[in-house]
Amino acid sequence: MLTINAVIRKDQGKGASRRLRLANKFPAIVYGGTKAPVAIELDHDIVLNTQTKEGFYTDVLALVIDGKESKVKVQAVQRHSFKPKLTHIDFVRA
């Protein structure tokens, strides 16, 4: 099972997302189940390398958010139109 580390986002909105992307991170969200949605930030290079591995899009992943592990699946991925960059990922709780 693939494991990805994440941090809960403190700031939200367009400006905060742009600052994240300039810091080589990007926003994501975890939703589904009975819990409330959680806005998180991920390290771009780590996720970019992880997404090339088999099973990233189809298997259940372990997402560690501030020390707490959640089982999630990738629901949607947004990419930059011509650069090899991820801009946002939606995770759904498994």
From Swiss-Prot:
Belongs to the bacterial ribosomal protein bL25 family. This is one of the proteins that binds to the 5S RNA in the ribosome where it forms part of the central protuberance. Pfam families: Ribosomal_L25p. The gene is rplY. GO terms for cellular component: cytosolic large ribosomal subunit. One of its GO terms (biological process) is translation. It comes from Sodalis glossinidius (strain morsitans). One of its GO terms (molecular function) is structural constituent of ribosome. Part of the 50S ribosomal subunit; part of the 5S rRNA/L5/L18/L25 subcomplex. Contacts the 5S rRNA. Binds to the 5S rRNA independently of L5 and L18. Transmembrane segments: none annotated. Keywords: Ribonucleoprotein, Ribosomal protein, RNA-binding, rRNA-binding. SUPFAM superfamilies: Ribosomal protein L25-like. It comes from the Bacteria. The keyword Metal-binding does not apply. InterPro entries: Rbsml_bL25/Gln-tRNA_synth_N, Ribosomal_bL25/Gln-tRNA_synth, Ribosomal_bL25_short, Ribosomal_L25_dom, Ribosomal_uL5_bac-type. This is Large ribosomal subunit protein bL25.
